């Protein structure tokens, strides 16, 4: 079997971190004996510059045919038209591929806890995953309108939309430490009342998982005061957007965090959580670990290569523990150095 991978370098530092990661993929495929082919497509601001829109039909169709999609980063101050922004292409891609589940791990690596803005003893050992519903909720609800006197957004969830994301979270929790925290605002929001009801019903199918409920404001506090208590957190779109960004600063650098977006039966999208960082683009100083860890998620989830994913992740953990990092993590290496060291390790 030959896996079909679509590469979307995007904007800013996206091309350099993605292209370096693809060089690692070539080494890994030879080592673990699997085949793949890459289709490169412009996306985001780069696509606006070339084609006048952030996501062309050609790119979208290629993504629909793919086994996996790797995205570098998109956006930047260059693209200011509110009706034609790079981020709109990403929203359209998620919706078109029905990428309803966003998986965001937050891990404080051994040897890197001093980088956290929180006390070391508070964050050491943190290993949590936020499962965010990605294609419904207030970002997509209708009706919506805006004028100078009034604005309206609609927060709507159906039972089916809640059930499918909650099943993803329960299955993930069952494969980890068996603890699921469901986040809502059940004390005031009707949508959250349905959310909590559905979570409780679905929990009966997963007796091995312990479930607790937290209001979103309480969860935001506990993420700071005791992040180690969490295993898997599941929440609706808006809450997940905020909480996952909050959690991402716990390790001390946005450059350490990967993410994946899943559908039930189509291609999956893998990307680091950081932005395009146009201020450092092309300077060979970007931290590529988030992109490489996203590649590891892709190896495990879409390319059926769990051993390769484990090896790649372990090499990264060892590098971080030994201080072999870029400047944002307190190290002295540049982007190219990171890829060269990993290439040497993988070739052994």
Curated annotation (Swiss-Prot):
GO BP terms in the entry: L-leucine biosynthetic process
Classification via NCBIfam families: leuB
Descriptive protein name: 3-isopropylmalate dehydrogenase
Record note on cofactor: Binds 1 Mg(2+) or Mn(2+) ion per subunit.
Self-association and partners: Homodimer.
Reported function: Catalyzes the oxidation of 3-carboxy-2-hydroxy-4-methylpentanoate (3-isopropylmalate) to 3-carboxy-4-methyl-2-oxopentanoate. The product decarboxylates to 4-methyl-2 oxopentanoate.
Assigned keywords, A-Z: Amino-acid biosynthesis, Branched-chain amino acid biosynthesis, Cytoplasm, Leucine biosynthesis, Magnesium, Manganese, Metal-binding, NAD, Oxidoreductase
Gene3D superfamilies registered for this protein in UniProt: Isopropylmalate Dehydrogenase (3.40.718.10)
Enzyme Commission number(s) of this protein: 1.1.1.85
Keyword Manganese attached: yes
Keyword Cytoplasm: yes
GO function terms (MF aspect): 3-isopropylmalate dehydrogenase activity; magnesium ion binding; NAD binding
Record site feature (Important for catalysis), residues: 139, 185
Name of the gene this protein is made from: leuB
């Amino acid at each position: 079997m030959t896996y079909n991978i679509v590469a979307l370098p995007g904007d800013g530092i996206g091309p350099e971190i993605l292209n370096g990661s693809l060089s690692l993929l070539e080494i890994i495929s030879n080592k673990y004996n699997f085949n793949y082919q890459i289709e490169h497509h412009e996306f985001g601001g780069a696509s606006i510059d070339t084609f006048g829109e952030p996501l062309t039909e050609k790119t979208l169709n290629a993504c629909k045919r793919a086994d996996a999609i790797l995205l570098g980063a998109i956006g930047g101050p260059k693209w200011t038209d509110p009706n034609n922004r790079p981020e709109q292409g990403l929203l359209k891609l998620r919706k078109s591929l029905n990428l309803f589940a966003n998986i965001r791990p937050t891990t404080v690596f051994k040897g890197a806890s001093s980088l956290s803005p929180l006390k070391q003893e508070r964050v050491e050992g943190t290993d949590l995953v936020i499962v965010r519903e990605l294609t419904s909720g207030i970002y997509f609800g209708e009706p919506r309108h805006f004028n100078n006197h009034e604005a309206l957004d609609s927060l709507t969830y159906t039972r089916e939309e809640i059930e499918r994301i909650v099943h993803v979270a329960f299955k993930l929790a069952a494969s980890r430490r068996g603890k699921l925290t469901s986040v809502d605002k059940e004390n005031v929001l009707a949508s959250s009342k349905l959310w909590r009801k559905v979570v409780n019903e679905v929990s009966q199918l997963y007796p091995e998982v312990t479930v607790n409920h937290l209001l979103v404001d309480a969860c935001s506090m506990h993420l700071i005061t005791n992040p180690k208590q969490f295993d898997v957190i599941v929440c609706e779109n808006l809450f997940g957007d905020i909480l996952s960004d909050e959690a991402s600063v716990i390790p001390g650098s946005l450059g350490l965090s990967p993410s994946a977006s899943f559908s039930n039966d189509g291609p999956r999208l893998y990307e680091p959580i950081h932005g395009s960082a146009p201020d450092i683009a092309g300077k060979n100083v970007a931290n590529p670990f988030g992109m490489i860890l996203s590649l590891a998620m892709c190896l495990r989830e879409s390319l059926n290569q769990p051993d390769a994913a484990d090896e790649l992740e372990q090499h990264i953990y060892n590098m971080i523990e030994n201080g072999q990092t870029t400047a944002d993590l307190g190290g002295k290496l540049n982007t190219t150095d990171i890829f060269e060291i990993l290439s040497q390790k993988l070739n052994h």
